[in-house]
Amino acid sequence: MATTTSRAAFEAVFPTLAEDLLAHAKKYNLPENAVKWFEQVLNVNVPGGKLNRGLSVPDTGIALLQKPLTDEQFKHLSILGWLTELLQAFFLVSDDMMDSSITRRGQPCWYRHPGVGLIAINDAFMLESGIYVILKKHFRSHPAYVDFLELFHETTWQTELGQLCDLITAPEDKVDLDNFSMEKYMFIVTYKTAYYSFYLPVALALLYLELATPENLQQTHDILIPLGQYFQVQDDYLDAYGDPAVIGKIGTDIQDNKCSWLINQALQRCNTEQRKLLDTAYGRKDSELEAKVKALYKELDLEKVYKEYEEKTVGEIRRKIAAIDESQGLKKEVFEAFLGKIYKRTK
C-alpha cells in the first residue's frame, strides 16, 4: 500500500478550492476585474512550493489509519492540507514585503509583480480569510469544526508572535549583536516555524479522524515542536554550509543580519578579538565581510558544533518517538516519517 500521498493527486484538489473561493467572492457581486485579480493571487501564491506542509496532512492520515484513505477521507484531508498552504501563502506574501525580498520560488515576490505593490497587503488578508470560507463550506458539520477554527486562529497568532520577535530582534538596517541570544532564537524558531510547519498538519489530521485526545495532542506537541526547532537550526546551518546548487538558493542570513543559530553559537564561543570582527562584519551587504564571518565560523569549528547538536537532538527525538503511547490511536510512524524526511537533509 502507498504510505505517502501522490503529489499529483494532492495538486488535483487545488483547482476546486480556488473555484470555491472565487464562487464565494462572486456572491458579493465582486466586479469581474477584481475576481480575475483574486484568481491570480491564488494561482501565483498558493500552489508551486514544495507543499511539504500540505502533503503532511493526508500522509499523517494514512499513517494513523494504517490503511489507504477512502476517497472522501483523501479529499477532506487534502483540503485541510491546502488550508495549511493558504496559511503559508498569507505568511510568505506578507513576510516578503517586510523583508524587502526579491524572489520567492524562483519568481519575483508577489508584491514585485507589475501593478501589485502595496495591494499585496490586502491580497495577503484575503488569502488568510479564504481559510475560513473553505472550512465553513466543507467542515461546518464536522464534530471538530470549532477545533479546526481555534487551531488555525491559534497557529496564526503563534506565528505572528514569532515574526514580531524576529523583526525587532534583527532589523536589517541596525546591527546590534547584543540583541541576540539563544533564548530569543529558540522563541523565534518555535513560534515562527515549528507550530505551523510541524504541529498544525498533524493536529489537523488527528482532529479530522477524531483521534485528537488531549494525550495524543500533547504527545504530538512534545515531539513535533523539538523537531521543528531542529529543522530550523538545520536550515540556518545549510544557509552557510550548504551547496547553493543543491539548496536552490544562495544563503543570505549573514548579510541580512539574521538572528540565526550559527551567529548565536559564534557569540557564545568567540574571544574579544573575534567579537570585534563580528560586530563590524555581520549584517553588512558586503560579500568580503560575509566571507570573513564564514571564515570565523570555520575557526570556531561550528560545523562540528552543529554535527554534535544534530546527533544529540535526533537521539532525544528518537527516544520520545520510541516511548509514544499508541493506546489512543496515535502512531509512531507519523513521527518517523517526519524525522526521516529531515534528518541529514542537504536541501
UniProtKB/Swiss-Prot annotation:
Kindly state which keywords UniProt assigns to this record, in alphabetical order.
Lipid biosynthesis, Lipid metabolism, Magnesium, Metal-binding, Steroid biosynthesis, Steroid metabolism, Sterol biosynthesis, Sterol metabolism, Transferase
So where does Mg(2+) 2 get bound?
95, 99
Is Lipid metabolism tagged as a keyword? yes
Record-listed dimethylallyl diphosphate binding positions: 104, 192-193, 232, 249, 258
Q: Where does the chain cross the membrane?
A: none
Per the record, what are the reactions this protein catalyses? isopentenyl diphosphate + dimethylallyl diphosphate = (2E)-geranyl diphosphate + diphosphate; isopentenyl diphosphate + (2E)-geranyl diphosphate = (2E,6E)-farnesyl diphosphate + diphosphate
Write down the required cofactor(s).
Mg(2+)
- Annotated residues that bind Mg(2+) 1 are located at 95, 99
Q: Which PROSITE patterns match?
A: POLYPRENYL_SYNTHASE_1, POLYPRENYL_SYNTHASE_2
Question: What binding details are noted for the cofactor?
Answer: Binds 2 Mg(2+) ions per subunit.
**Residues bound to isopentenyl diphosphate:** 50, 53, 88, 105
Any GO CC annotation of this UniProt entry: cytoplasm
Tell me which family the UniProt entry assigns to this protein.
Answer: Belongs to the FPP/GGPP synthase family.
Tell me what this protein is called: Farnesyl pyrophosphate synthase erg20
Taxonomic source organism: Aspergillus fumigatus (strain ATCC MYA-4609 / CBS 101355 / FGSC A1100 / Af293) (Neosartorya fumigata)
